[in-house]
């Protein structure tokens, strides 16, 4: 795939798959109209873990599912498998946008003392 072909694919995928879900069509699955992070905040209460951790747990589930499929995949693409790839990849991308939004929201809050991301080292 050339750079131009990839950019065309990328733009079309965002326009037809990601944006409709993030903006409205699938909104109820990820949040309520007044709070984009509602589901994760509710999960935070249930699990007693930060909403960002709850979100990354869900992403982990999607990645493990994708990984398991790839281990067994023989390289043939059926319509059902193609749809499954689309759903998993789309969900992972949307979760990443939501995580970035949560981090952005944290950036806008007043700083509190304690261990934070700035103390984390690779």
What are these regions (language model features)?
Residues 1-122:
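Intrinsically disordered, low-complexity regulatory regions
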């Amino acid at each position: 795939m050339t750079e131009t072909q990839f950019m065309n694919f990328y733009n079309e995928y965002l326009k037809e798959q990601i944006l409709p879900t993030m903006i409205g069509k699938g909104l109820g699955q990820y949040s309520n109209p007044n709070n984009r992070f509602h589901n994760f905040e509710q999960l935070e209460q249930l699990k007693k873990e930060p909403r960002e951790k709850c979100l990354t747990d869900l992403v982990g589930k999607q990645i493990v599912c994708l990984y398991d499929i790839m281990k067994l995949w023989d390289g043939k693409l059926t319509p059902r498998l193609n749809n499954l790839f689309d759903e998993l990849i789309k969900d992972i991308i949307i979760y990443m946008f939501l995580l970035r939004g949560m981090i952005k929201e944290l950036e806008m809050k007043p700083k509190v003392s304690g261990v934070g991301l700035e103390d984390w080292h690779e």
